[in-house]
C-alpha cells in the first residue's frame, strides 16, 4: 500500500515532462497588474539536501523556474502539475534536486513566490527567536519578562488557602496563566534544541532559561511526588488570568489548583528533570541531583497510581523512562520503558488490510475503546517514544516489534493519509460512527485534517503537525527511508507559509503573520507581539476546509506546545540533513 513519497513525486513530475519542456532561459518578468507571491514556498527556506516543494492554486500544469534573487539567474526549472487531492486545487512542484545555497524566488508565468533561502543554517534564526521567546514570557522576579517583575506573590493553595511560593516559570500562552501540563513543553523544546544542536551561539543561555522555567515546576511538585495542576482556571474561566500586587500572602494572590496534572504532564516532568541532569551535572552537581530526585519521586508516584492509559500517555511514559536511562543508566529504566512500550503496542491496529479497512498502524484510544486515538496538542509521543527506544536499545528483544510498529504507523497510516491532500500534512485523525464534518472517508473511517469546531474548545493544528514531523524524521533515519523525511519537511512548510493563506504562523519569522490574539481587553498590559512565538495554527471549518481566523484564540494565540514542537522539528531537520538522502 505504501510507496516511498519521493518515488511518487518523481512519477508525478516525470510523466508531464513528456509534454512539458520548460526553458531555463533568463529570469521572467512580471506582467502589469499581476498578483505577487501566489506561489507558495517555505518562507524561511530549505536545507541544501532537504526536500523542497512549491504550490500554486490551479488545475493546469505549468513550468516553473527557481531564480537567484541577486542575479536573476535561473538555477532550476521543472513542471508544476495538478494533484487531485483534498484542501483545494493546487499544482505541485518539486525542486529537491537544487542544492545550491543562496536567496531565491520561484516564478511560473506571471506568478511568483516570496524570497527564501537555501542554507545549512536556514532555520537558525527562527530557533534563536523561539529560544528568546521564553525569556520574554518569564513570570516572577525576572529582568526579561515583558511585564517584569510579575506574580512574585504566586500563590495560595486552593485546598488549604495557605500561601506557597510557586513564583517563576513562564506564562503559557497569550495570557498569564501557568498550566503545568502545557507549559512543561517549554522544557522539552528547549532541552531538545540544546542537545540536538549544541549551538555555538547559545553560550549557556538555553540552560539558564531552562533553570528559570524549572523554578516553577520543581516548586509545584508535592511531597507525594506528583506535580500539581496549574495556576489557571479555578472557579470559572480566566479567574486567575490577571496581574497581582506582587506582595505575597495578600488577598489578591492567585490560587494553585493542587490536584495532579494529567498523566502525560507527569511524564513530561520526568523527561524535563532527566534532561536537566545531563545539562547541569558538570556545572552544578547539586542542582542536577535535585532534578534527579524530583524525577524519581514523580516516577514512583506514577507507577503507584498506574498512570498512563492512552497512546499519548503510554508513549510519554516510555520516553520518560528512556530519558532516565540516558541520564542515569540502569537496566530498570530500560525494562520499564519496554514495558510501557508493550502496553502501547497493544493499542495499535495492526491487522491485515482489506477494502473496508484500508489503513492500519494507527492506535486505538484505550483498551476497550476502539475509537482511533486523536490528540491536537500533546504531541505524537506514541511515535516519538518508539523511535527513541529503537535508537537507544537496538539490541533489545522487543526492538523488532518497535521497528514494525514504526513502519506500520508511518508507512501504512501517515504516508497514505498525507498523499490525500496537496500540502502533504498529516491528519488530525480518524473517526468511526457518523461524519464529523467534511464528508471525507477512507474505507470504514471518516477523517478530518482539522479539529472539529462544534465544541467549546478547539485549536489549530501546528502542534499536531510539528510533533508528527519530529517522529517522522526520526523514523526516516531508523528505517533509512528518505520519503518519511520528505513528509516531515512538509509539516514545517505548512507552518512556515505553505498553506492557503501564504501565512507563516511563527511570529517574526517569514511573512504575513496573522494578527495575534489580543488580550488587552482582559488584563493590561496584554501579551505583546513576541518574535519566535508559534501560534496554535490554522484551523478548519465545519466542512474541514482551512480557516485562519486572524486574531482569534483558537488559531492565533501563542501556546507553549506549538513553540516546543516547531523548535524541536527545526532542530531535528538541521542536525539530520542526511536523512533526506
PLM regions and their residue ranges:
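Boundary at the C-terminal end of the N-terminal hydrophobic targeting segment
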Residues: 22, 27-31
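Contiguous beta-strand segments within globular domains
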Residues: 38-59
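Interdomain boundary/hinge segments at the C-termini of tandem beta-sandwich modules
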Residues: 118-120
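Glycan-recognition and catalytic cores of secretory/periplasmic carbohydrate-active enzymes
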Residues: 33-38, 65-88, 99-101, 105-114, ...
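Exposed aromatic-hydrophobic patches
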Residues: 90-96
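Bacterial N-terminal signal peptides that target proteins for export
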Residues: 1-11
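Bacterial N-terminal signal peptides
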Residues: 10-23
Amino acid at each position: 500500500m505504501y510507496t516511498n513519497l519521493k518515488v511518487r513525486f518523481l512519477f508525478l513530475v516525470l510523466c508531464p515532462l513528456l509534454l512539458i519542456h520548460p526553458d531555463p532561459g533568463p529570469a521572467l518578468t512580471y506582467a502589469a497588474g499581476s498578483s505577487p507571491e501566489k506561489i507558495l514556498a517555505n518562507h524561511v527556506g530549505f536545507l541544501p539536501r532537504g526536500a523542497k516543494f512549491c504550490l500554486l492554486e490551479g488545475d493546469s500544469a505549468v513550468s516553473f523556474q527557481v531564480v537567484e534573487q541577486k542575479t536573476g539567474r535561473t538555477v532550476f526549472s521543472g513542471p508544476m502539475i495538478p494533484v487531485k487531492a483534498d484542501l483545494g486545487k493546487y499544482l505541485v512542484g518539486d525542486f529537491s534536486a537544487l542544492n545550491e545555497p543562496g536567496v531565491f524566488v520561484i516564478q511560473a508565468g506571471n506568478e511568483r513566490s516570496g524570497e527564501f533561502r537555501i542554507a545549512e543554517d536556514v532555520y537558525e534564526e527562527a530557533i534563536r527567536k523561539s529560544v528568546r521567546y521564553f525569556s520574554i514570557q518569564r513570570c516572577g522576579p525576572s529582568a526579561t519578562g515583558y511585564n517584569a517583575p510579575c506574580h512574585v506573590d504566586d500563590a495560595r493553595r486552593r485546598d488549604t488557602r495557605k500561601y506557597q511560593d510557586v513564583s517563576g516559570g513562564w506564562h503559557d500562552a497569550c495570557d498569564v496563566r501557568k498550566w503545568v501540563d502545557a507549559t512543561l513543553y517549554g522544557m522539552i523544546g528547549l532541552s531538545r534544541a540544546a542537545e540536538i544542536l549544541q549551538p555555538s551561539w547559545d553560550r549557556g543561555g538555553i540552560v539558564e532559561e531552562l533553570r528559570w522555567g524549572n523554578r516553577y515546576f520543581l516548586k509545584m511538585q508535592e511531597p507525594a511526588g506528583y506535580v500539581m495542576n496549574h495556576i489557571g482556571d479555578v472557579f470559572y474561566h480566566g479567574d486567575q488570568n490577571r496581574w497581582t500586587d506582587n506582595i505575597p500572602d495578600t488577598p489578591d494572590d492567585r490560587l494553585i489548583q493542587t490536584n495532579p496534572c494529567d498523566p502525560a504532564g507527569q511524564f513530561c516532568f520526568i523527561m524535563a528533570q532527566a534532561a536537566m541532569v545531563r545539562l547541569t551535572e558538570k556545572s552544578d552537581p547539586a542542582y542536577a541531583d535535585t532534578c534527579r530526585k524530583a524525577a524519581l519521586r514523580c516516577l514512583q508516584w506514577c507507577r503507584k497510581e498506574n498512570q498512563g492509559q492512552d497512546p499519548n500517555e503510554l508513549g510519554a511514559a516510555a520516553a520518560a523512562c528512556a530519558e532516565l536511562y540516558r541520564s542515569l543508566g540502569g537496566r530498570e529504566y530500560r525494562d520499564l520503558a519496554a514495558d510501557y512500550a508493550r502496553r502501547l503496542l497493544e493499542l495499535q491496529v495492526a491487522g491485515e488490510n482489506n477494502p473496508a479497512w484500508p489503513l492500519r498502524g494507527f492506535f486505538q484510544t484505550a483498551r476497550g475503546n476502539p475509537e482511533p486515538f486523536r490528540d491536537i496538542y500533546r504531541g505524537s509521543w506514541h511515535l516519538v517514544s518508539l523511535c527513541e527506544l529503537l535508537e537507544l536499545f537496538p539490541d533489545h528483544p522487543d526492538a523488532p516489534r518497535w521497528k514494525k510498529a514504526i513502519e506500520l504507523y508511518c508507512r501504512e497510516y501517515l504516508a497514505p493519509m498525507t498523499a490525500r491532500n496537496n500540502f502533504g500534512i498529516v491528519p488530525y485523525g480518524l473517526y468511526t460512527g457518523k461524519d464529523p464534518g467534511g464528508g471525507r472517508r477512507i474505507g470504514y473511517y471518516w477523517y478530518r485534517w482539522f479539529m472539529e469546531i462544534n465544541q467549546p474548545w478547539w485549536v489549530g493544528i501546528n502542534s499536531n503537525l510539528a510533533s508528527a514531523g519530529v517522529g517522522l524524521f526520526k523514523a526516516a533515519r531508523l528505517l533509512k527511508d528518505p520519503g518519511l523525511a520528505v513528509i516531515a519537511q512538509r509539516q514545517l512548510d505548512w507552518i512556515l507559509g505553505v498553506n492557503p493563506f501564504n501565512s507563516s504562523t511563527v511570529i517574526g519569522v517569514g511573512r504575513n503573520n496573522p494578527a495575534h490574539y489580543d488580550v488587552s481587553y482582559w488584563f493590561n498590559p496584554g501579551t505583546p507581539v513576541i518574535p519566535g512565538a508559534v501560534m496554535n495554527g490554522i484551523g478548519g471549518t465545519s466542512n474541514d476546509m482551512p480557516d485562519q481566523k486572524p486574531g482569534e484564540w483558537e488559531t492565533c494565540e501563542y501556546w507553549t506546545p506549538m513553540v516546543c514542537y516547531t523548535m524541536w522539528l527545526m532542530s531535528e531537520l538541521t542536525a539530520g540533513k542526511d536523512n533526506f538522502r
